[in-house]
């Protein structure tokens, strides 16, 4: 899959995470590293290359989802990988 990475500003989602999941300090810290993204669609942005997900040697090793709520953007799903890295973000109101 050929991807085009774009600059991304995660400040807005960091603020929401600090308010809604303050106990998840590692996830909040890792959101700060989400400064480039690949927009698969209006509803989903990747922060980690996702080819061959969950296969050996793939960077994408899924662990869990965390759902956050934004007044402006609605429900947001964070894809959290095994090392608490942020794999991607999904905007449910854009599906």
Could you tell me what each predicted segment is?
Residues 1-63, 73:
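N-terminal domain-onset segments
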Residues 61-95:
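Short, compact, well-ordered microdomains
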